[in-house]
Amino acid sequence: MVKYSRDPSNPTKSAKACGKDLRVHFKNTRETAFALRRMPLGKAKRYLEDVLAHKQAIPFRRYCRGVGRTAQVKNRQPNGQGRWPAKSAQFVLDLLKNAESNAEVKGLDVDNLYISHIQVNQAQKQRRRTYRAHGRINPYMSNPCHIELILSEKEEPVKKEADNVVAPRKAI
């Protein structure tokens, strides 16, 4: 059994999925996941498919040094920095589909699901080496990541009963 960093508030109305040691850049995947927080499942899948087709960009907020600007991010972030991380989008999309099928097996309403928790952690770096001039050797590292997400059904709030307001009596 895999340990998640957070338990769902209602385990019977949620589905989980995670990927460990995924060979995809941590920084790009973190920005992709951050853009999907609290998004409905259908909207998130459409958004990632648009990213793969370069119709919408992922806004880069934390790891944004040297990232160019694009008009596709203007309404989502003040400085308009964004990219189209295809591999990260594909990995997260596959994980969303996995969680969706887990929800179907549990008997949840797929149209009513939203991403209640998504988190990306750094995995152990994979070391390689590159050979430089004058007999030197430099490290050539890759930065894989762990992704976990929880889909939950939206809870409809209990409707408040109408208050019967009693008019105050007039003093005689």
Swiss-Prot record:
Family annotation (Gene3D superfamilies): Ribosomal protein L22/L17
Cellular component GO terms, alphabetical: cytosolic large ribosomal subunit
GO-annotated molecular function: structural constituent of ribosome
GO BP, sorted A to Z: cytoplasmic translation
Keywords assigned by UniProt, alphabetized: Ribonucleoprotein, Ribosomal protein
Family that this chain belongs to: Belongs to the universal ribosomal protein uL22 family.
Protein name, entry field: Large ribosomal subunit protein uL22y
Source organism: Hordeum vulgare
